[in-house]
């Protein structure tokens, strides 16, 4: 097997990353979920102040996986990081690529004074076992936190009532 290299994503990786976002959405049984294109990823990640951090895993210079994360802030502990996505193509799963990608995110978080790394995993997703191997806590069962969301339409309605 070729050497697996983890590196910062480049603008030219955005087409592959967008394709992987769709593959991840398909796996998560939400094929209509992703609404962005690779141009949005390019703009938001590489123009002006980047809105996200992204690493890619490569084999023979071909992108085979990625992570996408960003900084958050916790009133309990300060600077934090959120892991939005981690994805490895099926041919490279169970070859420690996910571990290398996750470790790169953890290193970035620690080097930038983050006190925690948050993420969500679907209830049925076997990836939970992967995260538990590295001592991730399931906050839903441990602390009874539930995740909520306002979708764009509801967010607009809520904002329209703002004085």
Cite the ranges covered by each PLM segment.
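A short beta-loop-alpha structural element at the N-terminal edge
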Residues: 5-17
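Conserved GNAT-fold acetyl-CoA-binding loop/helix
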Residues: 18-44
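A short helix-loop-beta-strand connector motif used in the catalytic cores of GNAT acetyltransferases and
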Residues: 43-56
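Conserved beta-strand in the GNAT
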Residues: 56, 62-70
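Glycine-rich acyl-CoA binding loop
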Residues: 57, 94-102
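A short, internal acetyl-CoA/4′-phosphopantetheine-binding micro-motif in the GNAT/acyltransferase core
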Residues: 86-93
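Conserved active-site alpha-helix within GNAT-family acetyltransferase domains
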Residues: 99, 111, 123-143
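Conserved acyl-CoA
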Residues: 100-116
């Amino acid at each position: 097997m070729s050497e697996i290299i983890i590196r910062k994503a480049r603008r030219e990786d955005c087409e592959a990353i967008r394709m992987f976002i769709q593959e991840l959405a398909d796996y998560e049984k939400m094929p209509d979920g992703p609404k962005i294109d690779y141009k949005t990823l390019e703009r938001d990640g590489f123009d002006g102040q980047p809105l996200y951090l992204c690493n890619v895993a490569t084999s023979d210079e071909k992108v085979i996986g990625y992570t996408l994360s960003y900084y958050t802030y916790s009133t309990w502990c300060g600077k934090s990081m959120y892991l939005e996505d981690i994805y490895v193509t099926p041919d490279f799963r169970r070859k420690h690529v996910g571990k290398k990608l996750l470790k790169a995110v953890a290193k970035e978080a620690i080097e930038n004074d983050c006190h925690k790394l948050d993420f969500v995993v679907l209830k049925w997703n076997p990836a939970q076992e992967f995260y538990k191997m590295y001592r991730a806590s399931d906050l839903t069962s441990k602390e009874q936190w539930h995740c909520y969301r306002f979708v764009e339409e509801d967010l607009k309605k809520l904002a329209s009532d703002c004085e």
